[in-house]
Amino acid sequence: MTAFLAVGFGAAVGAWLRWGLGLWLNPAYPAMPLGTLAANVIGGYFIGLVLAWFAEHPGVPPEARLFVITGLLGGLTTFSTFSAEVVTALTRGLWLTGSLIAFAHLAGSFIATGLGFYSLKFLK
């Protein structure tokens, strides 16, 4: 139950941060959602930082890791999770695996988003 709450509370905070970044930054340049870009870049940076920190501090309770990584950064951006998976593969020397993960996520996401967008026409 503690893990469930850690993820949930972290996700709420991350989602509020993402929303706030959008409100603050998106009006500056409407053609490029800067709030989303900021959320993805900030999330990517912080997931790298906390992954390294948790690796150096193995005694930290798993609920803290769940709150920060799965909850907070996952709520801020799922891009941070994707980035962590690719960087983890690359730091293990798995260059092909890391590249395939990156390609699969990017291509899959773009294709799925396009399909979702255009499928609305058929659902009406």
From Swiss-Prot:
Regulation of its activity: Na(+) is not transported, but it plays an essential structural role and its presence is essential for fluoride channel function.
Keyword entries, A-Z: Cell inner membrane, Cell membrane, Ion channel, Ion transport, Membrane, Metal-binding, Sodium, Transmembrane, Transmembrane helix, Transport
GO cellular component: plasma membrane
Disulfide bond entries: none
Molecular function GO terms recorded: fluoride channel activity; metal ion binding
Entry keyword rRNA-binding: no
Catalytic activity: fluoride(in) = fluoride(out)
Topology with respect to the bilayer: Multi-pass membrane protein
Annotated residues for binding of Na(+): 74, 77
Cellular localization per UniProt: Cell inner membrane
PANTHER family on file: FLUORIDE EXPORT PROTEIN 1-RELATED (PTHR28259:SF1)
The name this protein goes by in its record: Fluoride-specific ion channel FluC
Native source organism of the sequence: Thiobacillus denitrificans (strain ATCC 25259 / T1)
